[in-house]
Regions:
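N-terminal secretory signal peptides that target proteins for export/translocation
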Residues: 1-21
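Bacterial N-terminal signal peptides
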Residues: 28-41
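Auxiliary tRNA-acceptor-end handling modules of aminoacyl-tRNA synthetases
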Residues: 50-339, 357, 361, 366, ...
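Soluble non-cytosolic domains of exported or imported proteins
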Residues: 123, 304, 337, 341-349, ...
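The catalytic-center signature of Zn2+-dependent metalloproteases
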Residues: 360, 370-393, 397, 550-606
C-alpha cells in the first residue's frame, strides 16, 4: 500500500503508521454506508411524504389553523367529514391519512336538465374509480389504471405499473392540516364548482350537444345539498353556464335565454366494496351481459389474455342450501313520487315480471318495488336508492333508459336508475301532437336546420341502413335533390348521419347499449293509431287505456332487464310463428317473445283476425336462462374459475332455438334478418307482408276519415306520415333476406350438426325480391286519392317551441315515395350486399344460391317493367317511375365507371344489364305511339343516349 502523502500546507499531522489504523478507517466507511442505506430506506420516504418536525411547524404556520378555517361551519360526519359554511358558501372535505391512496367510487348524475339535446334530468354522466394522493402541499385527484392488472404478489406488478399510465386529473391545494389527527383539509369547491376544473366533463360535451361553447361561471355556481353518511357522501352542485360567444349561440326553445342556463349535478362518493363476500362471475359470449373486463398479466396459461366478468347484483340466499330461498338483500326499486298515479301499477308489474326468472334461479321475491313517499327527504340520485323516474322533456330523446353503476374491479352492480320519458303517453293523450314534434325534429336533423340536434336515436330505423350507403357513390345519384323532410337527398342524409354518430351523446348511449330508441315511441304511436283507425278506439276509451298500460309495462320490464346486467337480444322476437302471435292461450303461458330485451314492435293482427296482446306479458325463455346463468348460486369457493364447469353446463344450451342471442354488434352488418330490431315472429318476411297490408288498410281508412276539431287536418297529416314510416320499416326488414345468413353464437358441442352460419333459403330470398317488387317498385305500389292528399294540411301555429312548417307547405308525397324507392334501391344494390351475394355462391350448393345475375336482372325488370315487359296498353311512365329508373341507371353507371367499390363480377353484370336495357329502350322507342306523352318519350331517349355514352366511353378509374 502506498503511503499517504500530505502537502506541507496541510494542518493535519501525517499518519505515521497507516496499517495500524486501517481497521478504524474500514469501520468509519462501513458506518457511513450503513447510515446512508438507513436514510434512503426509512427517513427519506418519510421526509418526502410530508413536512415533519421544524419543517412541519413551518408549513403549519404557512397554512391557516384548522379550527380557523372551519370556524362557523356545520360539521357533517360520515365516510368523509365535511364542513359546510353557508354564509361563505364554502364546503371543506377532511381526508384522513388512511384514506390517502384508498380507492373510492364517484357516480355523477344530471339532477336537472334542459329537456332537450340529451341534457335530461336523471341522465348518468360519469362513473369512475379514483384515489386521493398527497404530494407536498397538494392532494391529487387520481384515476388509477385498472385495465391492466396482476395477481397479488406477482413481481410483474411494478413493470405493469410503469408500462401503463394513470390519469392525474387535478391537483388541489391543501387548506389546512389538523395538528393532532394529521388530516388534510381541501376546499371541495376547487373540485366541484371550479371554472377551471370540470370533473363530470359537461363543459366539453356542450359544443357537441348544443352547437356552441359555454363556460362555467364560479359566481353563478354553488353547492345546493351536502350530506354525509357512514358509507357514502351525497353532494349536489349547481353549475351556472354562460355562452363564450353570444353570437354563435343556437336557439334553445326550452330555455328562457339561450345565452345562459343552470345544471344541477349530483355526486355520489362511496368506498369500493371489498371483502363483502361477492364473487365475480366469468362471462360467456353465448349469454348477453354487460361486462367488466381487464387484461391479466399474471395469467400465462389461458389462451385469452382478458378476464371478463358479467355485471350483476350481489344476491345471496338466506338459506344457502335451500332450492328456493329469499335473498339476504333483495333488489329494491323505488317508484319516484312524480310518476303519474295511473301508471304506477303498470310500472310495478313490469318490474316484478322478472321474479319469474329469478324463481328459476332459486330465489323468491328477489326484486321488490316500493313507492317513494311524497314527503321523502332523500334524493332520487342518492346512490343508496334504485329509482324509476318520470322524465319530462321538450324533445323526446328516448322512450326509456336503464343505466346501472358497477364496481369496476368486480362487475358488482351497486346502483341503478330507470328513466321513462313522459312523452310516451302524451303521444296518445294529446292526439299525436308529439309525433308532429318528432317529425319536425327528424326533419331538422336531416336538413341541418338545427346544428345542435345530436340525438343518436333521431334517425330511428334509418340509422341501421345509412351505414350501408356510406361507401356508395351517392354523388352519381339521380340529382333529384328533394327539398324537405325525410325525403332529403341521400348524400346529405348520409352526411348528417355521419356527423350525428360521432357526437358525444351518441357514443355514450351506443357504448352503454341502453337506449330504447325513439323508434320505440313511433311504434307505440303506430299501435295507438291502429286502434283508432282499425278498431275505432277514442283516446279516452278503455281499450286505449289498456294499450297504454301494456306498453308502459313492457317498456319497464325491458329497462329493468338492463339494470340487472342484461344486454339487448335482437333474436328475442323470433320465438313464435306469425299464426301464433295472437293466440293468448299460448302467449300468456309461454310469452309473446323469447326475450323482452329485444326491441319489440307492437303486435298488430292482420285485418280480419282476432287481436291478441299488443306486447308480451311475460319474460321469455331466454330471459329465464340468462338470469339463471348470472344469478344461480354455485359452489366452488371465492375463485371465479371454480364456477366454470357449472356455468359452461348452463351456457351449453345456447343451441336451443328459443335461447338464440344477438346483441347490438351482431346486427351491425345486416347479415341475419332474424337479428333485427322491431321485427316479430319466426317468419319476419310473412309478418312484414301482413304489416304492409295493414298500412295500406290504414291509409284507406284515412281516406274515409272525417277530420274534426281545430287540429283535425294536421292530425290527419301526422297519421298519414306515420303510416308511411311504418311501411318503410317493413320494407327495409324485407331487404335483409336478400343475401342474408343466419348467425348463431354456438360452440361445436352446443348443437350437433348445426353451424354458426347458415344461408337464408333460396325460396325466401326470392320471395323477398317479389315482396319488394310488389310493395316498392311496382307501378301501382303507391296509390292515394287526391282528396286525401289535399286534406294533409300542417299546423299553422308559429311561436317558441312550435315553428310553423314553411316549406313544403303542402304534403310532399312525391318526395316521400321517391325517397323510399331510392333508399331501398341503394340498400339492395349496395357494394356490401353485392359482395355478400358473390361470396354466398361459395357457401351454398350451386342450386341453393341466389346469384348476382338473378338479383341484378330481377331488379332491372322490376324497375324498367314498362320497357322490358311491355303490354298492349299505351306506354306512360309516371313521374315516380321515371325518378326510380334514373336512380337505377345511376347505380349501374357508377358500377361500370368504377365509381363504387363493387365486385368485378357485379361491374361486368352491370355493363351487361345496361346493354340489355339499351336494346329494350330502342325497341320501346320504335314502338312508341305518336300520341305518347312527351315526358315518357324524352325520358326513354335521354336514357338510351346516356347508356350509349357510358358504354362507348373509356372506363374511368378511381
Amino acid at each position: 500500500m502506498k503511503k499517504l502523502i500530505f502537502t506541507e500546507t496541510s494542518k493535519n499531522p501525517p499518519i505515521k503508521n497507516p496499517k495500524k489504523h486501517l481497521h478504524l478507517v474500514f469501520f468509519i466507511l462501513s458506518l457511513a454506508f450503513f447510515l446512508f442505506i438507513l436514510y434512503q430506506g426509512l427517513f427519506l420516504p418519510y421526509a418526502l411524504s410530508g413536512p415533519h418536525g421544524k419543517e412541519q411547524g413551518a408549513e403549519h404556520q404557512a397554512l391557516q389553523p384548522f379550527d380557523l378555517v372551519v370556524k362557523d361551519a356545520q360539521k357533517l360526519e360520515g365516510m368523509f367529514t365535511l364542513y359546510r359554511n353557508k354564509a361563505t358558501e364554502k364546503v371543506y372535505l377532511e381526508i384522513k391519512p388512511q384514506q390517502l391512496t384508498k380507492k373510492f367510487l364517484c357516480f355523477v348524475t344530471l339532477a336537472s336538465g334542459l329537456g332537450e339535446a340529451g341534457i335530461l334530468s336523471g341522465m348518468p354522466i360519469g362513473d369512475f374509480l379514483f384515489q386521493l394522493r398527497r404530494v407536498q402541499n397538494t392532494v391529487q385527484f387520481v384515476i388509477p389504471n385498472i385495465n391492466f392488472r396482476t395477481s397479488p404478489g406477482d413481481p410483474q406488478a411494478g413493470s405493469v405499473e410503469r408500462a401503463f399510465s394513470e390519469s392525474i386529473l387535478y391537483s388541489l391545494p391543501v387548506k389546512s392540516i389538523h395538528p393532532q389527527r394529521q388530516t388534510l383539509l381541501i376546499d371541495l369547491g376547487d373540485l366541484l364548482i371550479s371554472e377551471q376544473r370540470d370533473l363530470p366533463g359537461v363543459k366539453s360535451i356542450l359544443p357537441m350537444l348544443l352547437g356552441a361553447s359555454y363556460s362555467i361561471d364560479a359566481d353563478k355556481s354553488y353547492f345546493k345539498d351536502v350530506k354525509a353518511f357512514p358509507l357514502n357522501v351525497e353532494i349536489a352542485s349547481v353549475y351556472g353556464f354562460s355562452s363564450e360567444n353570444d353570437s354563435s349561440v343556437n336557439y334553445l326553445p326550452s330555455v328562457p335565454d339561450s345565452r345562459a342556463f343552470n345544471l344541477r349535478i349530483h355526486y355520489s362518493f362511496s368506498e369500493v366494496p371489498l371483502n363483502n363476500g361477492y364473487r365475480p362471475r366469468l362471462a360467456d359470449e353465448r349469454v348477453g351481459y354487460f361486462l367488466t373486463a381487464y387484461k391479466d398479466f399474471s395469467d400465462n396459461i389461458s389462451r385469452e389474455p382478458f378476464v371478463r366478468y358479467i355485471n350483476r347484483w350481489h344476491l345471496q340466499k338466506q338459506i344457502p342450501t335451500a332450492p328456493m330461498s329469499p335473498p339476504v338483500q333483495p333488489i329494491v326499486f323505488w317508484i319516484e313520487n312524480n310518476v303519474p298515479l295511473e301508471y304506477r301499477n303498470a310500472i310495478r308489474e313490469g318490474v316484478l315480471m322478472w321474479n319469474k326468472a329469478f324463481a328459476k334461479a332459486g330465489f323468491t321475491e328477489a326484486i321488490q318495488v316500493k313507492q317513494m313517499p311524497d314527503n321523502a327527504k332523500w334524493d332520487p340520485a342518492d346512490v343508496r336508492y334504485n329509482t324509476i323516474r318520470w322524465s319530462s322533456s321538450f324533445e323526446p330523446e328516448f322512450a326509456g333508459i336503464g343505466p346501472s353503476r358497477t364496481n369496476p374491479l368486480t362487475g358488482e352492480i351497486l346502483d341503478a336508475d330507470i328513466l321513462l320519458d313522459a312523452n310516451i303517453v302524451r303521444q296518445v293523450k294529446q292526439n299525436y301532437r308529439s309525433l308532429v314534434e318528432q317529425n319536425r325534429s327528424l326533419a331538422r336533423s336531416f336538413q341541418g336546420q338545427n346544428g345542435s340536434n345530436t340525438n343518436p336515436c333521431q334517425f330511428g330505423m334509418y340509422s341501421r341502413y345509412l351505414k350501408v350507403l356510406e361507401n356508395g357513390d351517392l354523388k352519381t345519384g339521380s340529382s333529384e335533390a328533394s327539398p324537405g323532410g325525410i325525403a332529403d337527398d341521400l348524400p346529405t342524409l348520409v352526411e348528417r348521419y355521419q356527423q350525428q354518430k360521432r357526437s358525444s351523446l351518441s357514443q355514450l348511449l351506443a357504448s352503454s347499449d341502453m337506449c330504447f330508441g325513439l323508434e320505440a315511441s313511433r311504434q307505440f304511436a303506430i299501435g295507438a293509431m291502429s286502434l283508432s283507425l282499425l278498431e275505432n278506439a277514442t283516446p279516452s276509451s278503455q281499450n286505449l287505456e289498456d294499450y297504454v298500460n301494456q306498453y308502459i309495462r313492457f317498456l319497464t320490464v325491458h329497462e329493468v332487464g338492463h339494470t340487472l346486467g342484461l344486454r339487448h337480444n335482437f333474436h328475442g322476437s323470433t320465438m313464435l310463428q306469425p299464426e301464433d302471435l295472437n293466440n293468448t292461450q299460448l302467449t300468456r303461458t309461454q310469452g309473446l317473445v323469447a326475450s323482452v330485451m329485444d326491441y319489440v314492435p307492437i303486435n298488430l293482427a292482420p285485418a280480419g283476425s282476432v287481436q291478441g296482446d299488443y306486447f308480451s306479458a311475460l319474460v321469455g325463455p331466454y330471459d329465464d336462462w340468462a338470469i339463471e346463468y348470472g344469478y344461480k348460486v354455485i359452489g366452488g369457493g371465492l375463485n371465479p374459475r371454480g364456477e366454470l364447469p357449472a356455468l359452461q353446463q348452463i351456457a351449453s344450451r345456447a343451441g336451443e332455438a328459443q335461447l338464440a342471442y344477438a346483441p347490438d354488434e351482431d346486427t351491425v352488418d345486416d347479415l341475419d334478418p332474424a337479428a333485427n330490431a322491431f321485427d316479430l315472429s319466426g317468419n319476419m318476411l310473412r309478418y312484414s307482408q301482413w304489416q304492409l297490408e295493414n298500412s295500406k288498410t290504414m291509409w284507406k281508412r284515412l281516406e274515409k276519415r272525417t277530420p274534426f276539431g281545430e287540429d283535425g287536418y294536421n292530425e290527419l297529416r301526422v297519421m298519414f306520415d306515420s303510416v308511411f314510416g311504418y311501411y318503410f320499416q317493413q320494407v327495409m326488414n324485407t331487404t335483409l333476406y336478400v343475401g342474408g345468413q343466419s348467425f348463431s353464437r354456438i360452440r361445436p358441442v352446443d348443437a350437433k350438426g348445426k353451424l354458426p352460419f347458415v344461408p337464408i333459403e333460396l325460396a325466401q330470398q326470392r320471395e323477398a325480391l317479389a315482396t319488394l317488387e310488389k310493395y316498392v317498385f311496382a307501378p301501382d305500389a303507391f296509390s292515394f286519392a287526391p282528396e286525401l292528399l289535399n286534406k294533409l294540411a300542417p299546423s299553422r301555429w308559429e311561436h317558441w317551441g312550435s315553428p310553423a312548417l314553411v316549406f313544403p307547405l303542402d304534403y310532399p308525397i312525391g318526395d316521400r315515395i321517391t325517397f323510399l324507392q331510392r333508399f331501398v334501391l341503394r340498400v339492395l344494390l349496395s357494394p356490401a350486399r353485392l359482395a355478400r351475394l358473390r361470396d354466398a355462391e361459395l357457401k351454398s350448393a350451386p342450386e341453393n344460391a341466389l346469384k348476382l345475375p338473378e338479383v341484378l336482372n330481377t331488379v332491372q325488370k322490376d324497375v324498367w317493367k314498362e320497357v322490358l315487359q311491355p303490354t298492349n296498353k299505351k306506354m306512360e311512365i309516371s313521374t315516380f317511375r321515371r325518378s326510380l329508373q334514373r336512380e337505377h341507371l345511376a347505380i349501374l353507371i357508377g358500377m361500370v365507371l368504377r365509381k363504387t367499390n363493387v365486385p368485378e363480377d357485379a361491374r361486368s353484370l352491370a355493363w351487361y344489364e345496361l346493354r340489355q336495357l339499351r336494346e329494350g329502350l330502342s325497341k320501346s322507342i320504335r314502338n312508341l305511339d305518336r300520341r305518347a306523352d312527351t315526358y315518357t318519350r324524352a325520358h326513354l331517349e335521354e336514357t338510351r343516349d346516356r347508356i350509349s355514352k357510358v358504354l362507348n366511353s373509356q372506363i374511368q378509374s378511381n
